């Protein structure tokens, strides 16, 4: 049960961090 919870937590973190990184990279490229 703990492994499933940590797995979904990892997916949630990845789904929130990845777009933020992409936006940051796009802003850096625009500058």
Curated annotation (Swiss-Prot):
The keyword Lyase does not apply. Signal peptide: none annotated. Its main location: plastid. Pfam families: PetL (PF05115). GO terms for molecular function: electron transporter, transferring electrons within cytochrome b6/f complex of photosystem II activity. It comes from the Eukaryota. InterPro entries: Cyt_b6/f_cplx_su6. It is found in: Plastid, Chloroplast thylakoid membrane. The keyword ATP-binding does not apply. One of its GO terms (biological process) is photosynthesis. It is a single-pass membrane protein. Keywords: Chloroplast, Electron transport, Membrane, Photosynthesis, Plastid, Thylakoid, Transmembrane, Transmembrane helix, Transport. The chain crosses the membrane at residues 4-26. Component of the cytochrome b6-f complex, which mediates electron transfer between photosystem II (PSII) and photosystem I (PSI), cyclic electron flow around PSI, and state transitions. PetL is important for photoautotrophic growth as well as for electron transfer efficiency and stability of the cytochrome b6-f complex. HAMAP family: Cytb6_f_PetL. The 4 large subunits of the cytochrome b6-f complex are cytochrome b6, subunit IV (17 kDa polypeptide, PetD), cytochrome f and the Rieske protein, while the 4 small subunits are PetG, PetL, PetM and PetN. The complex functions as a dimer. Belongs to the PetL family. PANTHER family: CYTOCHROME B6-F COMPLEX SUBUNIT 6. This is Cytochrome b6-f complex subunit 6. It comes from Liriodendron tulipifera. The gene is petL.
